[in-house]
């Protein structure tokens, strides 16, 4: 049962659990074995296990047993312009568990010019009191100066944060400059953290938004029209370039378009340390809904970068996720009510951005990628759990079924079929962007911290039972290549003697003035004579005074063998 609203609920006490007859699926192998769990950890894996009494046995009946999902991108209980998203940490993590996700990583979004540490502590207080599953935190850098740099160092050293997001969009609010990007990436690379980017060209978006409003386009379609995918792609390319120059690992959040996905794929093939995170929405649906006649429906899809209006985009992004060109998945779950979205009913730039997806994420990927033959079950585990654990330095505690790992497990039924509906989803949002979609693949049993959270379609969650899981810096999965490159890229000056030859005398020219004679033209070529325009023989009609007179500066070149009768150069 749910304990929402009750105070001082004790944390979950772990049960002794035995899963029998399941097929264990990790990212690198699948095999049949039983699993014994105690005190929130996996204690034994194998056949004919000897276990103590008082064990609850779960018959898997040959079904897949996979590591619990890790959703790397959520926005629960996020403040926005005096409002708060409708899914707080209780409702949001409850929805996560219903979909097979046993850990989330939420974004701390400090107000511009405010303290990152204070915002972090606020998020910790909210999540500790309400989260039903384990969680970690990213911290967004919404401004940059020496004080923020010191806070970043402290958050990494003392607070268990190893990832920070910067915004290349939201001009005059969160957007940072290229110089600041360079400084932030340099700082994070030295500290062993992961640089995340929201990649869009904010300057051009601001211009396009103004243009759309001047044209009278005020509805949700204006959102996607003012943010074409080229602006996402340009920012991705720029971020990859700056990250490469600073030797900092780059993580692109919310990959929404073919162009952005292709750039990440190409950069990885060239050896760049870059990771791409598509979200439930970009994997499961397209942006044609922005043109819906129903304003509330169209507004429900507003998120940034926007969903692509190209209906072939989800299939394309799933293919890149299946092939490993994109590495992991999040939901970017950020839900507002229709009334909250309606503050932008007359101006699309004021519509609060965000879509649902934490509950649907794993089923969407199974249906769109595994059931269609693009992806095997092991890659499914990789992109929904294991790769996230490796990138954020949680592996093998999370993201793997092995002795000593946390007992966060899901018995997955590949044959289950469910129809998505806002009437029965766990989110508090009135609208579900996947409404009516039939999805193959669903969790039968969800175990978190060794406790059964979902069984027989019923949730058994406890508010505040989730633990904060600290993420340490210098993840091997991310930084082994970075460290090797630092050794190879050790720069040294070339030893040479002092130059003692002549030095050209460069006279400084006042700004806007005429350059001095010594600075005009090429130093290796004499300056040509200057014609006095007031004495020119040029006329608007008729022959010119100097017509037929060959200029001393004109070179006449004859072809080899002399002039031909075909071409006259005289």
UniProtKB/Swiss-Prot annotation:
<dbReference type="GO" id="GO:0048678">
    <property type="term" value="P:response to axon injury"/>
</dbReference>
<keyword id="KW-0597">Phosphoprotein</keyword>
<dbReference type="GO" id="GO:0005615">
    <property type="term" value="C:extracellular space"/>
</dbReference>
<feature type="modified residue" description="Phosphoserine">
    <location>
        <position position="536"/>
    </location>
</feature>
<dbReference type="GO" id="GO:0010977">
    <property type="term" value="P:negative regulation of neuron projection development"/>
</dbReference>
<dbReference type="InterPro" id="IPR032466">
    <property type="entry name" value="Metal_Hydrolase"/>
</dbReference>
<keyword id="KW-0966">Cell projection</keyword>
<comment type="subunit">
    <text>Homotetramer, and heterotetramer with CRMP1, DPYSL2, DPYSL4 or DPYSL5. Interacts with synaptic vesicle protein 2 and SH3A domain of intersectin. Interacts with FLNA.</text>
</comment>
<dbReference type="InterPro" id="IPR011059">
    <property type="entry name" value="Metal-dep_hydrolase_composite"/>
</dbReference>
<dbReference type="GO" id="GO:0070382">
    <property type="term" value="C:exocytic vesicle"/>
</dbReference>
<comment type="function">
    <text>Necessary for signaling by class 3 semaphorins and subsequent remodeling of the cytoskeleton. Plays a role in axon guidance, neuronal growth cone collapse and cell migration.</text>
</comment>
<dbReference type="GO" id="GO:0031005">
    <property type="term" value="F:filamin binding"/>
</dbReference>
<feature type="modified residue" description="Phosphothreonine; by GSK3">
    <location>
        <position position="514"/>
    </location>
</feature>
<dbReference type="GO" id="GO:0035374">
    <property type="term" value="F:chondroitin sulfate binding"/>
</dbReference>
<feature type="modified residue" description="Phosphoserine">
    <location>
        <position position="541"/>
    </location>
</feature>
<feature type="modified residue" description="Phosphoserine">
    <location>
        <position position="259"/>
    </location>
</feature>
<feature type="compositionally biased region" description="Polar residues">
    <location>
        <begin position="533"/>
        <end position="544"/>
    </location>
</feature>
<comment type="similarity">
    <text>Belongs to the metallo-dependent hydrolases superfamily. Hydantoinase/dihydropyrimidinase family.</text>
</comment>
<feature type="region of interest" description="Disordered">
    <location>
        <begin position="506"/>
        <end position="570"/>
    </location>
</feature>
<dbReference type="GO" id="GO:0030027">
    <property type="term" value="C:lamellipodium"/>
</dbReference>
<protein>
    <recommendedName>
        <fullName>Dihydropyrimidinase-related protein 3</fullName>
    </recommendedName>
</protein>
<dbReference type="GO" id="GO:0071345">
    <property type="term" value="P:cellular response to cytokine stimulus"/>
</dbReference>
<dbReference type="GO" id="GO:0042802">
    <property type="term" value="F:identical protein binding"/>
</dbReference>
<dbReference type="GO" id="GO:0010976">
    <property type="term" value="P:positive regulation of neuron projection development"/>
</dbReference>
<dbReference type="GO" id="GO:0051764">
    <property type="term" value="P:actin crosslink formation"/>
</dbReference>
<dbReference type="GO" id="GO:0031941">
    <property type="term" value="C:filamentous actin"/>
</dbReference>
<feature type="modified residue" description="Phosphotyrosine">
    <location>
        <position position="431"/>
    </location>
</feature>
<feature type="modified residue" description="Phosphothreonine">
    <location>
        <position position="543"/>
    </location>
</feature>
<dbReference type="InterPro" id="IPR050378">
    <property type="entry name" value="Metallo-dep_Hydrolases_sf"/>
</dbReference>
<dbReference type="GO" id="GO:0005829">
    <property type="term" value="C:cytosol"/>
</dbReference>
<feature type="modified residue" description="Phosphothreonine; by GSK3">
    <location>
        <position position="509"/>
    </location>
</feature>
<dbReference type="GO" id="GO:0051017">
    <property type="term" value="P:actin filament bundle assembly"/>
</dbReference>
<dbReference type="GO" id="GO:0044297">
    <property type="term" value="C:cell body"/>
</dbReference>
<feature type="modified residue" description="Phosphotyrosine">
    <location>
        <position position="499"/>
    </location>
</feature>
<dbReference type="GO" id="GO:0051219">
    <property type="term" value="F:phosphoprotein binding"/>
</dbReference>
<dbReference type="GO" id="GO:0051491">
    <property type="term" value="P:positive regulation of filopodium assembly"/>
</dbReference>
<dbReference type="InterPro" id="IPR006680">
    <property type="entry name" value="Amidohydro-rel"/>
</dbReference>
<dbReference type="GO" id="GO:0017124">
    <property type="term" value="F:SH3 domain binding"/>
</dbReference>
<dbReference type="GO" id="GO:0030426">
    <property type="term" value="C:growth cone"/>
</dbReference>
<dbReference type="InterPro" id="IPR011778">
    <property type="entry name" value="Hydantoinase/dihydroPyrase"/>
</dbReference>
<feature type="modified residue" description="Phosphoserine">
    <location>
        <position position="539"/>
    </location>
</feature>
<feature type="modified residue" description="Phosphoserine; by DYRK2">
    <location>
        <position position="522"/>
    </location>
</feature>
């Amino acid at each position: 049962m749910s304990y929402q609203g009750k105070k001082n609920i004790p944390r979950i006490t772990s049960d002794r659990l035995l899963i029998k007859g399941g097929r264990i699926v990790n990212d690198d192998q699948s095999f049949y074995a039983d699993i014994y769990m105690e005190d929130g950890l996996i204690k034994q894996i194998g056949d004919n296990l000897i276990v103590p009494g008082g064990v609850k046995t779960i018959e898997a009946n040959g079904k897949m047993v996979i590591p619990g999902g890790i959703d790397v991108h959520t926005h629960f209980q996020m403040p926005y312009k005096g409002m708060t998203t409708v899914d707080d940490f209780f409702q949001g993590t409850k929805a996560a568990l219903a979909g097979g996700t046993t850990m989330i990583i939420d974004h701390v979004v400090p107000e511009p010019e405010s303290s990152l540490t204070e915002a972090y502590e606020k998020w910790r207080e909210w999540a500790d009191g309400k989260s039903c599953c384990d969680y970690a935190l990213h911290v967004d850098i919404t401004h940059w100066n020496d004080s923020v740099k010191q806070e970043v160092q402290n958050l990494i050293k003392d607070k268990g944060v190893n990832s920070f997001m910067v915004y290349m969009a939201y001009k005059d609010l969160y957007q940072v400059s290229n110089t600041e990007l360079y400084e932030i990436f340099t700082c994070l690379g030295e500290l062993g953290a992961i640089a995340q980017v929201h990649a869009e060209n904010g300057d051009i978006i601001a211009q396009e938004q103004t243009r759309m409003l001047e044209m009278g386009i005020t509805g949700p379609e204006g959102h996607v029209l003012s943010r074409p995918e080229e602006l996402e792609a340009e920012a991705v390319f720029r971020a990859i370039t700056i990250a490469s120059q600073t030797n900092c690992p780059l993580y692109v959040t919310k990959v929404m378009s073919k162009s952005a996905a292709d750039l990440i794929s190409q950069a990885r093939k060239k050896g760049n340390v870059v990771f791409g995170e598509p979200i439930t929405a970009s994997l499961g649906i397209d942006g044609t809904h922005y043109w819906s006649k129903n304003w509330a429906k169209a507004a429900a899809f507003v998120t940034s970068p926007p969903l692509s209006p190209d209906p072939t985009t989800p299939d394309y992004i799933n293919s890149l996720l299946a092939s490993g060109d994109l590495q992991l998945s999040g939901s970017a779950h950020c839900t507002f009510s229709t009334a909250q979205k309606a503050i932008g009913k007359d101006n699309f730039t004021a519509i609060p951005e965000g879509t649902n997806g934490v509950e649907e994420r794993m089923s969407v990927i199974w249906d769109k990628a595994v059931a269609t033959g693009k992806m095997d079950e092991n890659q499914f585990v990789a992109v929904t759990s294991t790769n996230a654990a490796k990138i954020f330095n949680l592996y093998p505690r999370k993201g793997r079924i092995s002795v000593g790992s946390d007992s966060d497990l899901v018995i997955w039924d590949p044959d289950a079929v469910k129809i998505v509906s806002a009437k029965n989803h766990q989110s508090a949002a009135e609208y579900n962007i996947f409404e009516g979609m039939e999805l193959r693949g669903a969790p039968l049993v969800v175990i978190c911290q060794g406790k059964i959270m979902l069984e027989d379609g019923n949730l058994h969650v406890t508010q505040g039972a989730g633990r904060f899981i600290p993420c340490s810096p210098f993840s091997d999965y991310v930084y082994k290549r970075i460290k090797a490159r630092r050794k190879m890229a050790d720069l040294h000056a070339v030893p040479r003697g002092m130059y003692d030859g002549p030095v050209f005398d460069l006279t400084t020219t006042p700004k806007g003035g005429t350059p001095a004679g010594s600075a005009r033209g090429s130093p290796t070529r004499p300056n040509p004579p200057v014609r006095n325009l007031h004495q020119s023989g040029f006329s608007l009609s008729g022959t010119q005074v100097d017509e037929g007179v060959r200029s001393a500066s004109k070179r006449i070149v004859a072809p080899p063998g002399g002039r031909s009768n075909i071409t006259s150069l005289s």
